Amino acid sequence: MRFKPAGRWLQTILLSLALVLCLLRFAFLRADFPNHSPWMIDQAKFTDEGWWASAAVRHFLVGHWRVAGDYNPASVVPVWPLLLALVFHFTGVSLVAARTVNVSFSVASVALVFAVVRRYGGTETTAAVAALLLAASPFAFAFSRLATLDTVVVFEWSLLLWVASYVKPGRRWPIVAMGILIPIMLLTKTTALVLVPAVLWVLWKKSPRAILAVCAMVAAAMGIYVCIVLQSRYATDYHYFYAINALAEVDLASTGSYLMQLFRHGMWVDRILYPAGLAVLLLSLAWLRQLWKNPLFAASWIALAGDAVFVLRRQDDYAPRYFLVMLVPLILGTVLTLQELKVRNRSLAALLAATLTLAIVLDTVQVLGFLSHRQYQFHDAAKSIQAIVDADPAAHRLLLGTSGDQLSLMTGIPAINDGYSNQDLRQKALAYQPGWYVGWNELDQDYMDDLSAFRLDEVANYAVFDREDRNRLKLYRMVPVKEASK
């Protein structure tokens, strides 16, 4: 297909802007998660990076992946810690290295979105718009700079859609690749299961017989992995992970309010793109039904619906990061509609194009605002804690606390968790004898009862982040009561 010079210039401009915005994600990776953002309630900014990386961090700090009685999620989601272990082999334990890997996945997702749109009938301009929307997203920007799992899952899902586009009778490599990639996605994050139906839909549209082969490979791979884990010393950790993540009973009486809450919180994804996407969905159901013949369009809404059902099932127990996997499906559905409207109704196409342009401009301004108003409160607090611990060799060099694993990733000081533990906290504290406790704001009385064998002396107090209940990080020296009484 030949393009007019104006079209080529537009594509070049869009892709150049996307590239610049992607590269900006690598800037200032030591900076804190943005304060006063729409996603300030998300606790991933002070816990999750450390939790998911903990196995790799421990491997290098203490020589083994697992700490008995502690929170060991790698038994269920091993892909990320295995990848970080490879990276840390060259860099050492490093928060910046972990975040760089995550940002790299986010940038690769932008490239994949471009490729996916092209593979499913989108023009180069449509694909470039999709890439720019993802590159400019402040939601993706903020969470891609945390070394958590959601960004990797978005990449894996996009990769699966791209691989699925090559499926056809007689071609084996896409089937084998999907049979491998789906288990990898599920072993990256268990909730990625909600995205699998969208992938299977595309596969069914390409080659119905291929579904059986892919499902058989996925079932075999997951079955073998689970059997191996349950026969190993990681079985307790495996069961504990699912126990603490079990869903609460459904409160049918509150379903209506939860549904309204879900629709309202969709604004976390994007304040313009989200309502535009909902309008596009209604338009496709009422008029542009031709769009549903495109497997990518249907798969996008299946994926979004799958994640929405999962979030709704959690009732009110969820965080903004749970919505991150909605972003790419929303973008794909919107840009494919824009392309269709250019043929069917130029006035509506112009309106949607103007809306997306406004979204890109406002999103870019917000991203630049995050970079220009960056803060290092958590980073500076972590370095101060590291200096205090290093200066007191008499205290056992082991942190205890909910954010202990996060600080371990940031400082290289070993840590254990006080919040998640398959061992009684009192017994664990006596067994491991941590020298330091890190907590947020006021001490929890239940924890204090469990730590009654120690006296907690406050050593430092730091202003960190913007949540009222989590805005003071405190360091305590843990002195055994017997030692203190001498």
Residue ranges and their predicted role:
Residues 4-9, 118-119, 171-172, 205-215, ...:
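Membrane-interface helix-loop-helix junctions at transmembrane boundaries of multi-pass membrane enzymes
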Residues 10-45, 218-233, 308-309, 360-363:
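Transmembrane signal-anchor helices characteristic of membrane glycosylation enzymes that use polyprenol
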Residues 22-28, 314, 337-339, 349-376:
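Transmembrane alpha-helical segments
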Residues 37-50, 60-81, 89, 96:
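Membrane-proximal lumenal/periplasmic loop motifs of glycosylation machinery
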Residues 52-57, 196-197, 203-292:
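Transmembrane-lumen/periplasm boundary regions of multi-pass, lipid-linked membrane glycan transferases
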Residues 100-121, 159, 283:
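Transmembrane-helix motifs of polytopic, lipid-linked glycan transferases
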Residues 102, 139-152, 319:
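Short acidic/glycine- and proline-prone juxtamembrane loop motifs at membrane-interface regions
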Residues 355-408, 414-415, 419:
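Membrane-embedded, lumen/periplasm-facing catalytic core of multi-pass transferases
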